[in-house]
């Protein structure tokens, strides 16, 4: 199996968690509830991608 099994998902997950966190913090600082919700959703998406990457890696072992 490919060495990068799950690594792409983990990388996308990390990016989404970081960007989502930034959007959430920006939304809090500017009192923009929409941006906060968008950031929280993107962080959650990142968590799912990270877990998916872990599962793919585990299955490829």
From Swiss-Prot:
InterPro entries, per database record: CsbD, YjbJ_sf
The organism's place on the tree of life at top rank: Bacteria
Chain intervals for the UniProt region annotation (Disordered): 1-61
Family affiliation: Belongs to the UPF0337 (CsbD) family.
Protein name: UPF0337 protein lmo2158
Gene source species: Listeria monocytogenes serovar 1/2a (strain ATCC BAA-679 / EGD-e)
